[in-house]
Amino acid sequence: MSHRDTLFSAPIASLGDWTFDERVAEVFPDMIQRSVPGYSNIISMIGMLAERFVQPNTQVYDLGCSLGAATLSVRRNIHHANCKIIAVDNSPAMIERCRRHIDAYKAPTPVEIVEGDIRDISIENASMVVLNFTLQFLEPLERQALLDKIYQGLNPGGALVLSEKFSFKDTTVGELLFNMHHDFKRANGYSELEISQKRSMLENVMLTDSVETHKARLHQAGFEHSELWFQCFNFGSLVALKSGVPA
């Protein structure tokens, strides 16, 4: 059962950096629905993309799986034999709850849940990889190496789904979308104190890139095609395709 997010409703004397700890994991479903515009749409559409791209006898990777929402969406839309989903997160609290969520929904496609660092995971025989609001928490200099590894591990015809919060080179547009995002959170019941305290904790941990930067990295990794397929305010998702015909 998900609890309502009230983590930052009272003043916190010493705000440290953001961590995905037990307290965050407990309220995460409520938090992300009220904080990330379009999140439910992205999750459901990841399932539709899985139906199109996942191939028989291949693997799907959900890197930074949190509580397993994307994994469950993918699994509901896999209709091939001998597929496997590998869901990875480095937060013990998230992994514990992810196991419960996955176990609560029975389906023929097996899910391997791994507590570990996505930078250390081998990507092999993949028809689809999901990075759903994960890359932004890696150090910027480490992001290209991960995308390179994903491209190498994807089979021809495979897809990467990359969802992120974006920054914007046009500061006027950036400010507008930033303010609209804050309006969205206010409309969902967050106070100015909650918004401010959470932002302070995230600012040194979540470092955002522009869509142009993401596309440049994807191109450098080898992806022949990439495009923004969803955006709401300063949040969105890209799909990157590896050319070729699935075996």
Swiss-Prot record:
Q: Which CDD domains match?
A: AdoMet_MTases
Kindly name one Pfam family recorded for this protein: Methyltransf_25
Q: What is its EC number?
A: 2.1.3.-
Show the PANTHER family listed in the entry.
Answer: CARBOXY-S-ADENOSYL-L-METHIONINE SYNTHASE (PTHR43861:SF2), TRANS-ACONITATE 2-METHYLTRANSFERASE-RELATED (PTHR43861)
Regarding protein family, the annotation reads: Belongs to the class I-like SAM-binding methyltransferase superfamily. Cx-SAM synthase family.
Q: What is this protein called?
A: Carboxy-S-adenosyl-L-methionine synthase
Q: Which GO terms describe its molecular function?
A: carboxyl- or carbamoyltransferase activity; S-adenosyl-L-methionine binding
Query: Which keywords does this chain's UniProt record carry?
Result: S-adenosyl-L-methionine, Transferase
Domain of life, per UniProt, equals: Bacteria
Please list the residues that bind S-adenosyl-L-methionine.
Answer: Y39, G64, C65, S66, D89, N90, D117, I118, N132, R199
Catalyses which reaction?
prephenate + S-adenosyl-L-methionine = carboxy-S-adenosyl-L-methionine + 3-phenylpyruvate + H2O
Task: Give the record's subunit note.
Answer: Homodimer.
| Purpose | Catalyzes the conversion of S-adenosyl-L-methionine (SAM) to carboxy-S-adenosyl-L-methionine (Cx-SAM).
Task: Mention one GO biological process in which this protein takes part, according to its record.
Answer: tRNA wobble uridine modification
